[in-house]
């Protein structure tokens, strides 16, 4: 038994949060078994419609009973090679039915899941596997033109802790011969013996909600990715944010286009599905034609999408006119500031409410829903500021979280409108600390130092407005400029498809503003035209870009975040 990932939070915190009803003895595997008992033969999970193009197999559709049976059989396969409580299982799989099964099977045994994006190659996998001491690794035999199981087998000797490597896929997708040391497993119905053995194991050694359930990874946009262990406690608390804001219920059909490797995919889609017992439709990798087709074919009621995609779709009325969107009632978006015209456009033209999310693997969860902010412009710009007197919000976590803004220079709490400061949070959604010997991310009062810069807004200070990552601020002549604000405005230009704002080094001013953009087809853009467009937005002159760079694409990591450090490096060069 690996004890390294057990008992993440101190007893005093567990006692406090359980006494307040924020945490309970419930674990993820218990939630799954409860849904199976209630839902039975109802549809649970659906494969990507284009699965045959990705792996060669036919898409699958499973009921809750079928899903449970295959989960039990897979758990038996893990158990047979000695995997158990506290072991870390590296997972690199696309969004399929089998990925759902791997997670649920591992958690039924107390195994810690560490998911990695499909885009990661041997270098990234080796680094994270050794950081987290993977005991086993599960992937797929093929994905497009890649052979992931073969890739892992080739670096196995460089991961001393790795005892087992699995290729998990339907029998039709498993090759006749796998690389040496790779065990092939296929979905199959559980035997009565496997069912009874798992029942005994769960009864005699149940999961502890304070034990690690996952080790996800920070995006590595600023430095080496950090491991983020999270227990059942934090996951089951934070999932209420992404259930309450879109008001997800058992009758919903969720379309998941985000890789299930971090907060966006796991908490944005997977856990709301599991907690409510609705239908989960998987999608991967992103393909706009398939995505829109799934919305129509599966009668999807809720999905998530990045702001750039929503803006692009809104500008292409002919594309949307060809799709039946009548079932779709809301869309989640976020990670970067939303453009008010985009949020307003979806609401006014299609009656679809866009929900603004801001989250992190560590446990940030700010959200603006139509229930709390009916005005789409407010919803794009602001988040509820929890704890303000005489203001109540619709989500459970708004009553659970403590939120502060702190001046990054003086360390003093900020209470006035319009003063930028670092967001710091405390509450039942927040993790216990990074994997390994990392500096503590918490301040002297136990609040998570997020590194995100916000300001208080609203007539009564009831809102928070995101400005930018602290490390991304451009400081021009002593004035702080938030790239995110500029990016949101530049993205409204009809020629701009994608944008990142960075600071160019300057000997006199310290930094000057540079805009790096990609353009829409058959458009052009000059710096003077962009500056004129921004002047019409009535922004301060010191924020205006002094350099415009046009690229074919912007560098992004595996989860879609722009790698500004690469843009800065090329700017310096």
Identify the role of each PLM range.
Residues 120-130, 137-139, 303, 427, ...:
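AMP-binding/adenylate-forming catalytic core of the ANL superfamily
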Residues 1-62, 66-81, 171-173, 532:
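N-lobe entry segment of adenylate-forming
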Residues 24, 44-96, 100-104, 121-126, ...:
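Conserved AMP-binding/adenylate-forming core of the ANL superfamily
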């Amino acid at each position: 038994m690996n004890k390294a990932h057990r008992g993440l939070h101190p007893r005093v915190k567990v006692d406090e949060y359980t006494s307040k009803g924020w945490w309970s003895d419930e674990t993820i595997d218990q939630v799954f078994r409860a849904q199976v008992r209630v839902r039975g033969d109802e549809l649970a999970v659906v494969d990507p419609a284009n699965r045959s193009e990705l792996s060669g197999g036919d898409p699958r559709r499973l009921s809750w009973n079928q899903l449970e049976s295959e989960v039990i059989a897979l758990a038996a396969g893990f158990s047979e090679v000695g995997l158990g409580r506290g072991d870390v299982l590296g997972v690199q799989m696309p969004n399929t039915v089998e990925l759902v099964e791997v997670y649920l099977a591992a958690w039924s045994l107390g195994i810690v899941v560490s998911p990695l994006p499909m885009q990661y190659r041997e270098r990234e996998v080796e680094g994270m596997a050794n950081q987290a001491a993977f005991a086993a690794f599960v992937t797929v035999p093929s994905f497009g033109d890649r052979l992931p199981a073969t890739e892992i087998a080739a670096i196995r000797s460089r991961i001393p802790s790795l005892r087992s490597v699995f290729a998990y896929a339907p029998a039709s997708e498993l090759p006749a011969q796998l690389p040496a040391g790779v065990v092939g497993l296929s979905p199959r119905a559980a035997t009565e013996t496997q069912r009874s053995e798992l029942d005994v194991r769960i009864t005699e050694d149940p999961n502890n909600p304070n034990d690690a359930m996952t080790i996800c990874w920070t995006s590595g946009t600023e430095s080496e990715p950090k491991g983020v262990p999270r227990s059942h406690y934090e996951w089951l608390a934070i999932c209420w944010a992404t259930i309450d804001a879109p008001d997800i219920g058992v009758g919903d059909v969720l379309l998941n286009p985000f890789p299930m490797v971090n907060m966006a995919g796991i908490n944005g889609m997977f856990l709301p599905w599991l907690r409510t017992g609705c239908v989960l439709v998987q999608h991967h990798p992103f393909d706009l034609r398939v995505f829109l087709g799934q919305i129509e074919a599966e009668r999807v009621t809720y999905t998530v999408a990045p702001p750039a995609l929503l803006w692009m779709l809104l500008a292409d009325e002919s594309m949307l006119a060809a799709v039946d969107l009548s079932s779709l009632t809301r869309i989640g978006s976020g990670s970067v500031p939303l453009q008010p015209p985009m949020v307003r456009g979806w609401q006014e033209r299609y009656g679809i409410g866009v929900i603004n999310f801001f989250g992190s693997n560590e446990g940030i969860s700010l959200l603006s829903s139509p229930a709390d902010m009916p005005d789409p412009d407010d919803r794009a710009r602001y988040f509820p500021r929890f704890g303000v007197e005489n203001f109540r919000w619709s989500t459970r976590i708004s009553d659970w979280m403590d939120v502060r803004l702190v001046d990054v220079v003086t360390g003093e709490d900020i209470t006035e409108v319009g003063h930028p400061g670092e967001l710091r949070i405390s509450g039942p959604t927040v993790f216990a600390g990074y994997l390994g010997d990392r500096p503590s991310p918490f301040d002297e009062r136990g609040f998570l130092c997020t590194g995100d810069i916000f300001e208080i807004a609203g007539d009564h200070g009831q809102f928070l407005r995101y400005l930018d990552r602290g490390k991304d601020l451009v400081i021009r002549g002593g004035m702080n400029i938030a790239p995110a604000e500029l990016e949101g405005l530049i993205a409204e230009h009809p020629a701009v498809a994608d944008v990142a704002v960075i600071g160019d080094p300057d000997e006199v001013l310290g930094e000057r503003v540079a805009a790096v953009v990609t353009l829409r087809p058959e458009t052009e853009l000059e710096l003077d035209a962009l500056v004129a467009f921004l002047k019409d937005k009535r922004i301060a002159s010191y924020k205006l870009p002094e350099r415009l760079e046009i690229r074919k694409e912007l560098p992004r990591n595996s989860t879609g975040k722009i790698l500004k450090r690469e843009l800065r490096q090329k700017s310096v060069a």
